From Swiss-Prot:
The chain crosses the membrane at residues 3-23, 69-89, 98-118, 135-155, 171-191, 217-237, 253-273, 294-314. GO terms for biological process: mitochondrial electron transport, NADH to ubiquinone; mitochondrial respiratory chain complex I assembly. It catalyses: a ubiquinone + NADH + 5 H(+)(in) = a ubiquinol + NAD(+) + 4 H(+)(out). The gene is MT-ND1. Pfam families: NADHdh (PF00146). PROSITE patterns: COMPLEX1_ND1_1 (PS00667), COMPLEX1_ND1_2 (PS00668). It is an enzyme of class 7 (translocase). It is found in: Mitochondrion inner membrane. This is NADH-ubiquinone oxidoreductase chain 1.
Length: 318
């Protein structure tokens, strides 16, 4: 049964990622007063399959001066981590019910940095290396904020277990009392997934394509798939943390429907932001984190620590 659940999770995740690419192209098209892809299949619905077929049937070219092992390992690692991150998410039941689910997600997502750094260094290209260094600095910096925000939320729920977060939010979504944290979390997830306006690692006008410039065909597709799977995963995590869905025991499918709708709305907001906002300058990106987000999150962490003590209400113990 576990193997079947794992296969279903992988297949549904890949299907969601494939159609997210189509939704993004359609949404960007309509926001720029054009149609977007509409040739392959009815209304362009088969476009993701055409893209996959084209990418995976091309010959993968490797630069002669690249480091072969790291060059091949990097995209495989990125894709594996993107799949692994889904295991503890409650949808409505997690594949593996970790007591430290949030800690597992935070630790595993940090490993993505290695795949980006390896790909940039192994490509033996200045553009790729600069893109990789930018991405690593950005992701490591914003993980500081994500960790502190998660710590504040954990002090409210009293557990690292994602199911306990849903129990905590049975009567009130955490986005209402913790809206400053939710806003900073959402902005940090944009930076963590390297999306507009924080897509400095693949600034087309400066770095052509960033860390994956020397990749083509299948390996490039693996990076591309990992990026879009991380976007959906981050929004699913945001839904669990701040928009916790009540779990009705009489009809569990209501949980899944509600969870999916909220995740889709947040993902659509990601795409809308890409169409609406220009790219940040690198110094603005770092100033936003170290001069604005970090002091604010530390202050709110102190608030989350002191308030339960002040009003004599400890969080639920597991």
């Amino acid at each position: 049964m576990t193997t079947m659940n794992l296969l279903l999770l992988i297949m549904s995740t890949l299907a969601a990622m494939a159609f997210l690419t189509l939704v993004e192209r359609k949404l960007l098209g309509y926001m720029q007063l054009r149609k977007g892809p509409n040739i392959v299949g009815p209304y362009g619905l088969l476009q993701p399959f055409a893209d996959a077929m084209k990418l995976f049937t091309k010959e993968p070219l490797k630069p002669s001066t690249s480091s072969t092992i790291l060059y091949i390992t990097a995209p495989a690692l990125a894709f594996s981590i993107a799949l692994l991150l889904w295991t503890p998410l409650p949808m409505p039941n997690p594949l593996i019910n970790f007591n430290l689910g949030l800690l597992f997600i935070l630790a595993t997502s940090s490993l993505t940095v290695y795949s980006i750094l390896w790909s940039g260094w192994a490509s033996n290209s200045n553009y790729a290396l600069i893109g990789a260094l930018r991405a690593v600095a950005q992701m490591i910096s914003y993980e500081v904020t994500l960790s502190i925000i998660l710590l504040s939320i954990l002090l409210t729920s009293g557990s690292f277990n994602l199911n306990m977060l849903i129990t905590t939010q049975e009567h009130l979504w955490l986005i209402l009392p913790s809206w400053p944290l939710a806003m900073m979390w959402f902005t940090s997830t944009l930076a963590e997934t390297n999306r507009t306006p924080f897509d400095l690692m693949e600034g087309e006008s400066e770095l052509v394509s960033g860390f994956n410039i020397e990749y083509s065909a299948g390996p490039f597709a693996l990076f591309f798939m990992a990026e879009y799977m991380n976007i959906i995963m981050m929004n699913a995590l945001t839904t669990t943390i701040f928009l916790g869905t009540f779990y009705p025991t009489h009809s569990p499918e209501l949980f899944t429907t509600s969870f999916t709708i909220k995740t889709l709305l947040l993902t659509s907001l990601f795409l809308w932001i890409r169409a609406a906002y220009p790219r940040f300058r690198y110094d603005q990106l770092m100033h936003l984190l170290w001069k604005s987000f970090l002091p604010l999150t530390l202050a709110l962490l102190m608030w989350s620590t002191s308030m339960p003590i002040a009003i004599s209400s400890i969080p639920p113990q597991t």
